[in-house]
C-alpha cells in the first residue's frame, strides 16, 4: 500500500520471466489475474524483463499501486505510456476493490460488466461483487452492450463509485497512515465477503488508525 513492491509481486514477476525463458512462446503473450492476481499481472507488465514482448495485460478487478511503485514504473520505463496502452481493466460494475490505491490503467481501457449477485433463491449476495462468478453468465463475461449489441465501456454501479470516493480521500492521508487505513479497509471488504487477504493482515493498530484518522477524513 505504501511500499515499492511486495514479495508476492516479485514472485509473480520472477515466475513469469522463468516460464518465458525456460519454455519460450509462440504467437501472442498475455498476463492476467483476478484481484491480487490482477495487481500482480499489472506489476509483471511494468517490471518483467520481457515486458516489451507482452501483447496485453488483463487485470480483472485488480488493485492499483503505491505512489512509490508508480514513480518507479515511470523511472524504469521510458515507454511507460505505451505500456499503459496495452493494459486493460475488467470489473464487475459493483466491484469496490479495483479503485483502491493508485490506479494506473487508463480510463479508456477500463470496462464495467454486468454483476450477477443473486443466489439461486433470488436474494442478493454481495459476496459476488468481487468474485469472478459475479461477472460470468454461462461460460462468458456478461459485457454491457449498446442497442446494436456492441461491447461498451459500461457504467459503474454505486458501490464502485463509493469505493472511488473513499480511495480519493484515502490518498490525502499522510504516507505513514495511508497504508494502515488501506489494509484495514481491504481486509474489512474481504471479511464481509467471507474471504481473507492473500498476503497481508490488518492489525489492531491499523484498525485504530482507520477509526481515529481515516474514517473522519474519508467521510468529511
Language-model features, listed with the residues they occupy:
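Alpha/beta hydrolase fold serine-hydrolase catalytic domain that processes acyl esters and thioesters
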Residues: 1-28, 48-220
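Gly/Ala-rich beta-loop-alpha elbow adjacent to hydrolase catalytic centers
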Residues: 32-37, 41
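Short glycine-enriched nucleophile-adjacent loop
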Residues: 41-49
